[in-house]
Amino acid sequence: MRYIVIILWIACLGACNPDVKQKVTVNGKLTNYKGNKIYFEISGRDSLVKAELDSAGRFSACLELDEGTYVRLMNGKAAFPLYLAPGMKLRVEMDAAKIKNGEYGSVVFPEGINKETRMMIHYYENQWFPSTEELFIYTPAEFKELLDTIVGYNDGLIEDFLKADSSGYDRDFADLFKLQVKVPLAVSYFYYPVYHALLNPQDQSEIPEDFNIFDEILPKNDSMIYNKVYRYKTYEISYWNEKIAQELKDFSGEPAQYFNVWFDKLSALHLCPQIAGDVAHSFIMRHAKEMTPEVKEIVRSRSKGV
């Protein structure tokens, strides 16, 4: 009887503890693939999970997840979006060449696929994402209006798909995915001044203060979103570095003063420790080669307080 109680207690720990990772099995076959490996990029993790492809393109992989999340299945330049959750078993048949060309609907799931993955397939096959030439040719006012229209259209793609299918789904994941697909558009704001000057040098319009619509649309300083949304870290680190750079664009003091003021600006943002640390690390790495011994000592000292 005592052993039965112990077994039940262990089972309860696994079921009740959300941090206990559970296995997800993915197997299938690739055609027109590159090399002899397939990779899984799990949102929020720095390392990849890899699986070997045999001579016929077959593979089998076991992932460990503690909750439903976004996973990219990758081979060469082909990448396919998946929603995977603890306990799932998935079989997939994929032509890597077609995926590289954006034919996401060509993927076959012999044993069925979840609504979340179908939502992403629908989105990526129908999303509105302008070319560089189309995106940066517009004046600041036109650019802002265009981005606002694109966001509305793309959000509609997701919401309409979810409403049209009455089956259940992970609402939290869908909400995070709606943030995820905005990140590439949000990043375009960082490149707008340079690309616009190249593509439309005649336009001398001033950039208004409320130019960046993603200042309000995308949450900032939220550890959960920062860690869970695919490539959100890259966006937010760039966002805060750009914000500080703009505040210091007219600074004319000595390098040592600049780095001290930079860290003062970072502290004034009151960011979560992880985010502040990542922002500082990015800034330091970008300027590492130009640092004098005096500046290095300042950076070493100020970094301890981040």
Region annotations inferred by a language model:
Residues Y3-L13:
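Sec-dependent N-terminal signal peptides
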Residues V5, N36-K37, E236, Y258:
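Acidic, low-complexity intrinsically disordered regions
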Residues C16-L176, Q180, S188-Y192:
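A non-transmembrane, solvent-exposed segment enriched in polar/low-complexity residues
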Residues V49, L271-C272:
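Ser/Thr-centered flexible coil motifs
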Residues N114-K115, T139, Y226-V229, C272, ...:
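Intrinsic-disorder/low-complexity, polar/charged segments
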Residues E134-V261, K265-L269:
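N-terminal, charged low-complexity regulatory/assembly segments
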Residues L179-P193, Q274-K289:
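Short, hydrophobic/amphipathic alpha-helical patches that form generic packing surfaces
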Residues N260, A276-V306:
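N-proximal helix/coil linker or "cap" segments that precede and/or mark the start of modular domains
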